[in-house]
Amino acid sequence: MTGNDLDVLLGAWELTGRSHTADHDDITGTLTATRLLDGGLLQLDGRMLVGNTEIHSLELIWPDDTGSGFAAHVYSGSGAPLNYRWSRRGDTIVHAGLGMTYTGAISTDGATITGTWLPDPDRPDMAEAAYDATMRRI
């Protein structure tokens, strides 16, 4: 994997989604992705509203030492940074951490990413946190 594998994320995005326990879209937000330090890091600055809960996050992503993906730290203002991972295979992007994994399909033109956050198999206790999410480039 190269640092360019996640370049599809560069730019500004609008996020919409629906919790699996909701009967209507209950997730909105924005995400902006930029390169830092001569391209060595990818920064994701996000804001989400999930129901009535507002979430702000800053994520720093870099190629991991094994060359098999990307490591990330997410800072959300609620304590120590959280460890996440990213990978991309063709038109599929994966973002995983804290017992949940997002698998998204990148549209042919790169303007939409549609997917679902699901609990990892060993984390059935996270089932109520599952949600569908669509990112549209703005």
Protein language model regions, located:
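N-terminal helix-cap/turn-to-beta initiation motif at the start of protein domains
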Residues: 1-12, 107
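Short, well-ordered, mixed-charge alpha-helical segments that flank or form enzyme active sites
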Residues: 81, 104, 122-126
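A short, Trp-centered hydrophobic/proline-enriched beta-strand micro-motif
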Residues: 10-16, 114
